[in-house]
Amino acid sequence: MNKAEFIDLVKEAGKYNSKREAEEAISAFTLAVETALSKGESVELIGFGKFETAEQKGKEGKVPGSDKTYKTEDKRVPKFKPGKTLKQKVEEGK
């Protein structure tokens, strides 16, 4: 599903009057999640899931086919843990 199709789905599910309203709702939601995660906070929507950050350790490696090595730094990355209800809905959709 692409963004335009998702906007249509949100418009119907949320009973918005226009695609613009649905797109604004999606933008507000994503901005709120981005803001919370950038502050190190988590966002938990009971039944749907939890957005949080995790520390990803740096690693060392070797470039295949050469003797060059590289090292990456530690960084914070976003994570999503699906909730029980979401898992059940996905399972039912099989």
Curated annotation (Swiss-Prot):
GO terms for cellular component: cytosol. This is DNA-binding protein HU. Coiled coil: none annotated. Homodimer. Residues 68-77 have a biased composition (Basic and acidic residues). The gene is hup. It comes from the Bacteria. InterPro entries: Hist_DNA-bd (IPR000119), IHF-like_DNA-bd_dom_sf (IPR010992). PANTHER family: DNA-BINDING PROTEIN HU, DNA-BINDING PROTEIN HU-BETA. GO terms for biological process: chromosome condensation. SUPFAM superfamilies: IHF-like DNA-binding proteins. Residues 56-94 are annotated as: Disordered. It holds the Pfam family Bac_DNA_binding. It comes from Helicobacter pylori (strain ATCC 700392 / 26695). Histone-like DNA-binding protein which is capable of wrapping DNA to stabilize it, and thus to prevent its denaturation under extreme environmental conditions. GO terms for molecular function: DNA binding; structural constituent of chromatin. Residues 78-87 have a biased composition (Basic residues). Belongs to the bacterial histone-like protein family. The keyword DNA-binding applies. SMART domains: BHL. Keywords: DNA condensation, DNA-binding.
